[in-house]
């Protein structure tokens, strides 16, 4: 019977001493409080340069899981693209040039789709603005921007500033206009809610939408009048001079998001010949280009293809003939699999995966426990089975409920997680295993912005906890650690040599 080493990632569980709308600190968490007092712990960095992001940029789930799983600081797409723009090589990118050449050759249209936001989590609006400028420089005559609106990694009603910037740039360059707007709730689903994606797709491709207005700003104002914040703006088309824009054969579409998980579904709708999740009028003959690789199965050009890291935690465990399990509910399943493995889709030998469906609710404040009960049941059963050397799991609650801005619901989510942690603690200690508890970034630790007194729905840059729960004697060996130090710590407790590619350091020393 194997002694399991369990890594619990509490998504969005940051640490803050402030009790100002801090759902984590103010919730009733007897198990967490006792673990915090009784077991070795420290705080580690999950944002900024320490996870390969620009200075002061908040971390996110993709970045967090990549850094944890790879055991080294992995420089993120945001940083790479910023560097290409700074060095003026962005416009020389082969995939981008091919998309633009296709438009010029066919005298067709260039469509940019993506999250128009300064959030820096899934995209950055500066990348969109740079692409618009490059298109003008290279001779594009007609460019249409299909803007997905944020309100999740940014304040809920903050899109006006971004829309005005885009409008002004397009007008100054006499290049085109914003042809549709849509909340990310529709265009960037990742939970197989294809009815949402269908509405976004039809607005972009077929100019078929519930609402049509004369400008993107008017569309936003009318959405607010219906009490729909940025994230939930119903897909809307913009009519200019009596003209509605459609995507047609021989057009080029460039998807400007750099993060994969919420870009996959709508990309498949654009590119899959045998797509069957909702009816399309036809399969378009277009040049479809993505800024980064969203899914290796997508038939499209990729501007910044990934470099597969070697000797990630999963690969090292496989090479040492260890069994491993990855488990999460739908919202975070790609993070403990694809992202944790450094962008690898395939399972390693000896790696099992369990996907628990996320509840089908409009927003997760309606069901703060999400699918944590089912995740915990499977985890406890896996620990009791003695089958696995290493288990990696993710609890989505503190992030997904935190994103709703509902403080009371976030506290309920935290309190439910506390009960789940109690069950895991009992199972691990009973079987003489090791449990590490951490987070990939903060969120529920600040539910209201103290400066604006408005709901704070974005991630925080706060440090995150790293706790060891087990019978071994452990001492903190590394102050000011970071997410990339977690994998070396797990290898240390399991008695496995750390490969040279892992540049992280062990956070705890354990008595032999």
From Swiss-Prot:
Its cofactor is Mn(2+). Binds 2 manganese ions per subunit. The keyword Manganese applies. Disulfide bonds: none annotated. Catalyzes the interconversion of 2-phosphoglycerate and 3-phosphoglycerate. NCBIfam families: pgm_bpd_ind. Monomer. This is 2,3-bisphosphoglycerate-independent phosphoglycerate mutase.
């Amino acid at each position: 019977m194997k002694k399991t080493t369990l890594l619990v990632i509490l998504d969005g569980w940051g640490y803050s001493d402030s009790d100002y709308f801090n759902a984590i600190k103010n919730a009733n968490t007897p198990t967490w409080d006792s673990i915090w007092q009784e077991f070795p712990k420290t705080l580690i960095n999950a944002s900024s340069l320490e996870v390969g992001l620009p200075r002061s940029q908040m971390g996110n789930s993709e970045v967090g899981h990549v850094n944890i799983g790879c055991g080294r600081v992995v420089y993120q797409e945001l940083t790479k693209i910023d560097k290409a723009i700074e060095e003026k090589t962005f416009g020389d990118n082969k995939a981008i040039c091919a998309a633009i050449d296709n438009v010029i050759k066919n005298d067709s249209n260039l469509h940019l789709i993506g999250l128009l936001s300064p959030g820096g989590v899934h995209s950055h609006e500066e990348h969109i603005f740079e692409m618009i400028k490059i298109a003008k420089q290279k001779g594009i005559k007609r460019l249409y921007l299909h803007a997905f609106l944020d309100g999740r990694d940014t304040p809920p009603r903050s899109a006006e500033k971004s829309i005005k910037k885009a409008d002004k740039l397009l007008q100054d360059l006499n290049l085109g206009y914003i042809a549709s707007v849509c909340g990310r709730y529709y265009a960037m689903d990742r939970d197989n809610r294809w009815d949402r994606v269908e509405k976004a797709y039809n607005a972009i491709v077929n100019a078929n939408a519930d609402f049509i207005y004369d400008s993107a700003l008017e569309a936003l104002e009318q959405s607010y009048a219906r009490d729909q914040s940025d994230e939930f703006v119903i897909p809307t088309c913009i009519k200019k001079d009596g003209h509605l824009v459609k995507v047609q054969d021989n057009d080029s579409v460039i998807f400007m998001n750099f993060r994969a998980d919420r870009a996959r579904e709508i990309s498949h709708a654009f590119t899959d010949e045998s797509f069957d999740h909702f009816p399309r009028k036809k399969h378009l003959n277009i040049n479809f280009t993505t800024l980064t690789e969203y899914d290796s199965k997508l038939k499209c050009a990729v501007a910044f293809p990934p470099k597969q890291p070697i000797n990630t935690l999963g690969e090292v465990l496989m090479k040492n003939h260890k069994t491993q399990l990855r488990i999460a509910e739908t919202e975070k399943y790609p993070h403990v699999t694809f992202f944790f493995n450094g962008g690898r889709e395939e399972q390693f030998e000896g790696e099992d995966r369990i996907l628990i469906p996320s509840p089908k609710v409009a927003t997760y404040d309606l069901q703060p426990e999400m699918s944590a009960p089912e995740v915990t049941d499977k985890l406890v059963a896996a620990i009791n089975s003695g089958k696995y050397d290493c288990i990696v799991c993710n609890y989505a609650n503190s992030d997904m409920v935190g994103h709703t801005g509902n403080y009371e619901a976030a506290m309920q989510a935290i309190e439910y997680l506390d009960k789940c942690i109690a069950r895991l603690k009992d199972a691990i200690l009973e079987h003489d295993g090791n449990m590490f508890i951490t987070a990939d970034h903060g969120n529920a630790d600040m539910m209201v912005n103290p400066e604006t007194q408005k709901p704070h729905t974005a991630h925080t840059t706060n440090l995150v906890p790293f706790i060891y729960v087990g019978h071994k004697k452990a001492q903190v060996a590394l102050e000011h650690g970071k997410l990339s130090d977690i994998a070396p710590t797990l290898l240390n407790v399991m008695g496995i040599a750390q490969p040279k590619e892992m540049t992280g350091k062990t956070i705890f020393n354990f008595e032999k």
